Amino acid sequence: MPWAADCWRILRVSLPQYFWLTCSLHKIKKMISFLTENIKMPHLDRKAVRAWIAAVAATYDGRKVGNLNYIFCNDDRILEVNKEFLGHDYYTDIITFDYSEPGVVSGDMYISLDTVLSNSSKFHTSMDKELMRVIIHGVLHLCGLNDKGRGERAVMEAAENRALDMWYKKQY
């Protein structure tokens, strides 16, 4: 189980029920965290990225941002996560674990910077643009979009392009 979900499960079991009622009655600051495993942190304007993510999520029925953890890693780590949790034996750019509740997007997103780099070359785009596409791709999954079924990939790509347009026009 990804680390945030495991911590959440432990807290849920170990803290008294009144604590959770109190939390639900008061605004608790939600977080978007950027973490690394076995790789150097990419340069990001974290404040701008957080605002952009919140703006994109809000375009999907006014969804709010809960707790989002971006875990940047290498290909070896993402392959390990892919095998362990999804039973897939291949590299990918992002794996999203969804812990969302109605109206609030929350989750862990593992991003392989190695795959992002190779995809940027493959798709003739910059590393920065490809990274932003992958970052928002995870949020779009948390907002309910899929990319595996017939026609879903085109819908996802259009949503990514709208979100990237917001990013580059600073409309967030």
Label for each model-derived stretch:
Residues P2, D6-L131, C143-Y172:
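An acidic/histidine-cluster motif and surrounding catalytic segment
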Residues I136, L140-G144:
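Short active-site segment of divalent metal-dependent hydrolases/proteases
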